[in-house]
């Protein structure tokens, strides 16, 4: 009986923490700018995908392997992508590839250090301060 109560308490605590984090993001002006840049066509990624996207970006940065994006087919990035912001405390957002591409300039204005991670988690687009788009290949 004590174990069930303990599990129930732990689940409630985790839920309360998620709600608190959500409230904190809603008050964050930069996060509101991020949402505005995506014109509301995105959702906050689940925690497991959030962690996978952050890990993919960290690997790409550490390995430093990249190639220019020229000639890359849009088909390569069809589906959903994850926006990883330069501000580590902001949640990863999930959005359709077409919406992310359509709003590139707005994303750069909000956070020039933002990354976009493809659904497959093996390709990362990086939007740099100098308006250059690079393709990271971490496979």
For the regions a language model picked out, list residue spans one by one:
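Structured alpha/beta or helical-core interaction and ligand-binding surfaces enriched in interleaved
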Residues: 1-132, 136-139
